[in-house]
Amino acid sequence: GDEALFLLQGSEAQMQAALARTPELIEPGLTVLNRELLVGVGGIDLYARDSQGRFVVVELKRGKAGHEAVHQLARYVQAVREQVPGPVRGVLAAPDITVPALKVAQASGLEYVKVEALPQVPEEALQPTLF
């Protein structure tokens, strides 16, 4: 029912929050610009800039990433490319990816980074301190 859906969204949101705070888990030198930058194709999970100043669009998946995630990321990257000057990278961050999806990603110039579904981030980094 709805409960399972809520839990799923909750942990995807937790993963997003954790990676927004510690983007170096995806790649050293990554700076998160805006967690939810809308570009007319739905919400981008993480929008960042790499150490060389290139824009990076990050698509997060809690489970094994498949074709759907790769196509979604490709659409986001295309949409961002139309709006910003300079190169735009697309990174799919997930615990695992199917072999066909990885081949499609690589053929499309997208990158896959293995990230645990719930990265090990100190608890206090995830929650504002309660006084």
Q: What residue spans do the PLM features occupy?
A:
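Charged, terminal alpha-helix-loop-beta segments
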Residues: 1-131
